[in-house]
Amino acid sequence: MAKIKAEYIWIDGHSPTPKLRSKTKIIDGPVSELSQIPEWSFDGSSTLQGVGHNSDRAMRPVDFVPDPIRGGEHILVMTEVNYPDSTPHKTNKRVNLVDVVKRHLAHEAWFGIEQEYTFFRGRSPLGWPEGGYPAPQGPFYCGVGADEVFGRDIVERHLDACLYSGIGISGVN
């Protein structure tokens, strides 16, 4: 059996805007089913999800996709955060969403995910005047041209990576 890289990804405890975290585990591959991916742990005191004397947190895999950066049989593993006893951690908002979706299956909800981007140079958004603000959004919203849009090459690479991995994305702005 070959060894592959599984990049475990989770949402941390920062508020009001949580951050993504990840770490790599070497596992047996190739992987074809979620059940082949083991749970793993991390130090929650470093991610605002625990305190020093009680900081072990569990990552339970909930989905996986091909890794568009590493290629081959390597995978990205989406996880939810639990306490060591397998109960959902207070920052695990996914568990609430799963409950809502199950209760309202008959409504056949639709979701369209569009990725929007803000690139920074230092502490300011790229293209903004030093210490100031740009013109109103109108001219550069869904803009075209080097004077309106920055980082389009990164946007295209990200979109290609999502499509390669089978991640549902319906467009970019």
At which residue positions do the language-model features occur?
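Glycine-rich, acidic/polar active-site loops that bind/position phosphate-bearing ligands
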Residues: 1-173
